[in-house]
Amino acid sequence: MREQVELTLTDFNRETLEHVRKALNDIKERSGRKFTVQVQKKTVHQLIKESLKPAVSGDRAKREFDFIYCTGLFDYLSDHTCRQLMDIFYDLVAPGGLLVATNVEPSNPRRNGMAYLLDWHLIYRTAPDLRALKPGRAPDDALCVRSDATGVNLFLEIRKPANG
């Protein structure tokens, strides 16, 4: 890990953020690495609302990230909302940076147990469904969809061109 690493973690749940902050600080202590961990509690609604502010006010400095990883969120959101978030995230990725979003595939062998025993309902997406969430400004050749070894978890990877 490089010395100039800054991690910004965003979630709507304060307990989740505190748990991750503590875990990363423990790793930082044990490894002797120096990196910054910032957490921010925001809802999806807040992210979307805040993304409109720069266009209105024009005075907010735009932050850029080398890597944005959105996991465990799109399984609960409509295609429309996911596309909005992907556009926002893509705008925040620095030229040459990587945006990754995950979703569970419909072939999940635990799907029925999750739904009927645990009342845990997800919005499942196939690889073409996930590909359809591509940000509007992202070139088609800049993305790919991969799966983990189980084939259940899909990853939409979008590399922003170095020229922006």
Which residues does each PLM region occupy?
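Conserved amphipathic alpha-helix within the SDR
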Residues: 52-60
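Helix-to-beta-strand junctions that scaffold the AdoMet/dcAdoMet cofactor pocket
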Residues: 77-78, 93-94
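Local beta-strand N-terminus motif with an aromatic residue
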Residues: 64-65
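A conserved beta-strand element that flanks and buttresses the S-adenosyl-L-methionine
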Residues: 69
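Class I (Rossmann-like) S-adenosyl-L-methionine-dependent methyltransferase catalytic domain
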Residues: 1-6, 12-53, 80, 88, ...
